[in-house]
A protein has these predicted regions:
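Nucleotide-sugar donor-binding patch of glycosyltransferase catalytic domains
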Residues: 71-74, 82-83, 111-186
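Donor-binding and catalytic core of enzymes assembling or modifying cell-surface/extracellular glycoconjugates
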Residues: 39-125
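Secondary-structure boundary motif
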Residues: 13, 17, 52, 74-78, ...
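A short acidic, often aromatic-flanked loop/helix-cap motif at beta-alpha or helix-coil junctions
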Residues: 6, 88-91, 147-150
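Electropositive phosphate-/nucleotide-binding environments in soluble metabolic enzymes
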Residues: 5, 40, 66, 166-170
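Flexible, glycine-rich phosphate/dinucleotide-binding loops
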Residues: 33, 66, 89, 129-130, ...
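Mid-sequence helix-capping/hinge segment at a functional interface
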Residues: 1-35, 40, 186
Length: 186
């Protein structure tokens, strides 16, 4: 997997991304199901904070993730871009390689970000980082390890998904902060 600097320049122009702000990737999807997805309003609130701090947010995912990406971009405000369904895997590689950091559910794109060495915060709900961790020293994992998790179910069998709703935006922001404020940009 090799990022293409020319590919990123093309994408920035094609997708109208901001040239003067570092990007942070959000990957809110998880093909397995909603029990692996951090709440959309939480992504939106985190995105709003990042935009206020001078970052732009790139929401990545498949066309199936477009509604979630729309909601996140709306909640985060100007400087957040829903790229779900608008990019190919090679484009996601270029965006992740250029991003200052990423916030992600346990998903395929999480593993792509880890392989690229992108600093990331990985959020685990119904799965466990003991089975499918991001293989990177630049990864921070947040996993509550509740009595009911990991359940490995697609939807929460108890109907509450506390394993994800219990992960607060502040906790994710704190885990993300060192990567955002690193002196050397990626």
């Amino acid at each position: 997997m090799q990022p293409d600097p020319a590919g990123f320049a093309r994408l920035r122009a094609q997708l109208d991304l901001l040239a003067d702000r570092p990007g942070v990737c959000f990957m809110p999807g998880a093909e397995y199901g909603p029990a692996k997805q951090w709440p959309i309003p939480s992504y939106g609130e985190l995105g709003r904070r990042l935009v206020r701090q001078g970052f732009q947010v790139w929401v990545l995912g498949s066309a199936k993730d477009k509604p979630a990406g729309d909601e996140i971009a709306t909640l985060a405000g100007e400087g957040a871009f829903n790229l779900c369904g608008r990019t190919e895997l090679a484009d996601a590689v270029d965006l992740l390689a250029t991003a200052r950091a990423a916030v992600t559910n346990d998903s395929g794109l999480m593993h792509v970000a880890a392989a690229l060495g992108t600093p990331l915060v990985a959020l685990y709900g119904s799965s466990t980082p003991h089975h499918t961790p991001p293989l990177s020293d630049a990864a921070q994992v947040i996993y509550l390890g509740l009595e009911c998790s990991p359940c490995f179910k697609r939807t929460c069998p108890l109907g509450h998904t506390r394993c994800l709703t219990g992960i607060g935006v502040e906790r994710v922001a704190e885990a993300l902060a060192p990567a955002l404020h690193a002196t050397a940009p990626r």
